[in-house]
Structures are given as C-alpha cells and as structure tokens.
Curated annotation (Swiss-Prot):
<dbReference type="Pfam" id="PF10187">
    <property type="entry name" value="FAM192A_Fyv6_N"/>
</dbReference>
<keyword id="KW-0779">Telomere</keyword>
<keyword id="KW-0539">Nucleus</keyword>
<feature type="region of interest" description="Disordered">
    <location>
        <begin position="95"/>
        <end position="164"/>
    </location>
</feature>
<comment type="function">
    <text>Involved in telomere length regulation and promotes fully efficient non-homologous end-joining (NHEJ) by a mechanism activated in postdiauxic/stationary phase.</text>
</comment>
<comment type="similarity">
    <text>Belongs to the FYV6 family.</text>
</comment>
<dbReference type="InterPro" id="IPR019331">
    <property type="entry name" value="FAM192A/Fyv6_N"/>
</dbReference>
<protein>
    <recommendedName>
        <fullName>Protein FYV6</fullName>
    </recommendedName>
</protein>
<feature type="compositionally biased region" description="Basic and acidic residues">
    <location>
        <begin position="19"/>
        <end position="47"/>
    </location>
</feature>
<keyword id="KW-0158">Chromosome</keyword>
<feature type="compositionally biased region" description="Basic and acidic residues">
    <location>
        <begin position="58"/>
        <end position="72"/>
    </location>
</feature>
<dbReference type="GO" id="GO:0000781">
    <property type="term" value="C:chromosome, telomeric region"/>
</dbReference>
<dbReference type="GO" id="GO:0005634">
    <property type="term" value="C:nucleus"/>
</dbReference>
<feature type="region of interest" description="Disordered">
    <location>
        <begin position="1"/>
        <end position="72"/>
    </location>
</feature>
<feature type="compositionally biased region" description="Polar residues">
    <location>
        <begin position="111"/>
        <end position="123"/>
    </location>
</feature>
Length: 164
C-alpha cells in the first residue's frame, strides 16, 4: 500500500474479506502499470536522448578548460611552418652539395688531356680568381737558416725628400 501513489483505500466496516481486497488492489496496480508502461521504442528514444545530453555536458566541460586560444594556435602554426622551411632549406642544400660532389667526381674521372685542362667549370657561387703578387723574403747574409723577414720596399729618394 505504501508503494501506491494513490490515496489509500480503507476497508469499510462490515466487509472483512481481505483476499478480495488484495485482488482488487493487484488489478488496480496492473492496470496502472499498463497505463504508465512505455513501449520499447519510447524507452530507447528516451535512453538515447539522455545519453546524448550527457555526452554534450561532458564535451562542454572538457572544452571549457582544454580549448586553445587563437594566439596559441597562430604560434603553433608559425612554429610548424618554420620547421618545414628549415627542412626544405636543408634538403636543397643537401641536393646542391650532392650535385657539386658529382661534378667533382666527373672532373676527376675525365682523362687529363690539354683540351680538358683548358676548360674550367665556373658556377655562380665560385669566387672570381685574381692575381696576387707575393714578395720575396729578404734574408740576411749572417742568418741563412733564420726565418725570412718581409720588409717594405724602399722608395728611391726624390728631390723633394732630399731637401727636407
């Protein structure tokens, strides 16, 4: 009787048939359960709705403290682009070094004839050769084994320097 949400029914005076009263209450409970019982599709629909709402609550909670700001995203993207650029530069450098090495190997493998020695391979990165004058070392007569000393060339005295 405590389970029944309806108001309790009391036994009238004079009727002491408890078994018939129990049967009546049982029938009333079954009829009430039939009315309140939902179909399987309704139960599944409500269950999926509850699960979806629970999942949405969990994602809101997670996103509230794990979301990255736009500045942080920009910084992360910039770092990734810098790494890709460094990788590209390194691969280009490695390819150019490989080409230079192959050219040098080809030059070494070619027969050394006068025709081939006159030809020089000049690339944009090679320095332009210039002529350099090297002065002879001046050695003193007394110290032949000593290291040579480079001295400035002496200028011939002109009329102007003699007058002073």
């Amino acid at each position: 009787m405590a389970d029944n949400p309806k108001a309790p029914t009391f036994i009238k005076e004079g009727s002491g048939d408890l078994e018939s009263q129990r049967r009546n209450e049982q029938v009333n409970r079954e009829v009430g359960e039939l009315v309140t019982r939902k179909s399987l599709s309704d139960q599944l629909r409500e269950n999926s709705k509850k699960k979806r709402q629970q999942f949405q609550r969990q994602t809101k909670e997670k996103n509230s403290f794990t979301r990255v700001s736009n500045d942080d995203l920009d910084h992360i993207n910039k770092v990734k682009l810098d790494e890709l650029e460094k990788l590209r530069n390194f691969s280009q450098w490695a390819e150019s070094e490989e080409r230079n090495r192959r050219k040098q190997l080809q030059l070494l493998q070619q027969p050394s004839t006068p025709e081939h020695t006159n030809k020089q391979v000049i690339s944009k990165n090679d320095p332009i050769p210039t002529s350099i004058k090297v002065r002879k070392l001046k050695t003193s007569n007394g110290a032949k084994n000593a290291l040579g000393v480079i001295s400035k060339p002496k200028h011939k005295k002109t009329d102007r320097t003699q007058k002073k």
